[in-house]
Amino acid sequence: MQRELTRTATGTASTWASLKQEIIEAAPGLGIDSIGFASADPFLSLKAILEEHRARGYESGFEEPDIDKRIYPELYGSQPASLIAIAVAYPSKMKDPPKSDKGKYRGILARSAWGKDYHLVLREAMEKLEAFISERVPDAILKNMVDTGELSDRAVAERAGIGFSGKNTMMISPTLGSWIYLGELLTNIPFQPDEPVTDGCGECTKCLDACPTGALVGPGQLNAQRCVSFLTQTKGFLDEEFMLKIGNRLYGCDTCQIVCPKNRGLNWDHHPELTPDPEIVKPLLLPLLDLSNREFKDRFGQSAAAWRGKKPIQRNAVIGLGNFKDVSAVPKLTEVLLDDPRPELRGTAAWALSRIGGENAMTAIKQASEKEQHEQVREMIAQAHSKLEEQEQAEQQTSAELKAEDSQGPTTIYYDEMETPVGTLTLCATDRGLCRIDYGSFYAKEALLQQWARTWVGEYVYVQEPEKLREAAEQLREYFAGERREFSIAYDLRGTPFQEQVWRALQNIPYGQSVSYQDIAESIGRAKAVRAVGGANNKNPLPILFPCHRVSGANGSLVGYAGGLPVKMKLLELEKE
């Protein structure tokens, strides 16, 4: 599919070298933070990768469907003479971010949706660059693209020396990190190409380990169908697995960038138009459900988050309210469940109500089951009903303990973070002992930790106190160093009697060995409760210490793990050594 080379602009090699230097010097004044030049040769090595990506079902559906158009640069029917890649840096930190309070919980937009829509920002910068070039080269032919164009922005940027392609699939600049927007110009000016960046990720796998859904299936390999960023932008129903992982995200996901060491300490706030409005990028969830189309456009219209309309964001707000277990949201969620014309929101509201629980939630579910006609929504209502019944039983078992704790005032939950070979761990403990180990930072797990505390602790307050977690952290470091096989730490288990029975059974699995769910079920005298054992295993609050990574499928296959399968494999390999 090689195209005829476009008519080259009039000039000499010396002319283009001088112009290139002029462009580099002018770039900051045009709103460009990094600029590079590349050949316009076809991206032939990319073709096999894209074809395999498609064959495996990893595409999002947002890409250009014609792979050849993504491989062969095209300038109005001809092959351009060269490519110019640009990068605009954006903020990673928010000044005075509002916090979620009880009854006033907030969602979050990914940083790529902070401030003015980056498509507009990039186009404005590239149009200034086009004008700059055209003024000096009247017969220049120029065409700009952002991520809605045919070419792969990252492939162009990598060839042009903007940065290297990280294991999280992001373009990582040696100076700007991955907090950058990318765009490119195709031109008939034959600029001398820049050298690619030789830096890389090395042995680091923090992004792979931290990905909430395991969407990073390998270094530089993304299954978009599992990516939280993609999932938040879809318009249909979402599986419970994904709704739990979305947390309070309304649009996008930054986890793989937050944990990246190349981004440590980097924050770019020199583009005023990209400065986030805290009330827009971290909005209260409940009011989002009442937004009209006009109100949504007025509030979010300038953000990149608006491009899919209000339905995905409202659905995600419902998910967030469910994950926060916001009791104050039950009336509004009941209204959505019973009256909203959109089945996706009705079904999601049923799920959210089952997460929150309580008599009012059960009443709403029963009312909906009598009137709902949509088949998939009816299924979600039935599932919600079953979960609420299970919750009632669990609450009866734990109510006495919770009442005793409530009478003594809020329980302090101490937390701290530690870096390990499998990524960041957040440790939590009460005065009784260690109560949780979570994969990821406290920031990333805050919604999950709050909902857990509301369910199992009652009144609570989280306080960062490294000293309270010092002994647990030290024993974990010894484990990762291969110097410890057993732990001697005081625990504070919070779960149903059956769950606690399963969790304690996990402690009996020998170091370096694996057992099946069936083995665990038999060990506690519940041979027929294999599925229930699996459910309890999935809710294990103390992975590693209660080694659920040593549990395999019936045929010895790897099964899901809270930290993701790559982490599970690492732990098993560590114990083999």
Task: For the regions a language model picked out, list residue spans one by one.
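Structural detector for internal amphipathic alpha-helices that build alpha-solenoid repeat scaffolds
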Residues: 314-326, 346-358, 378-390
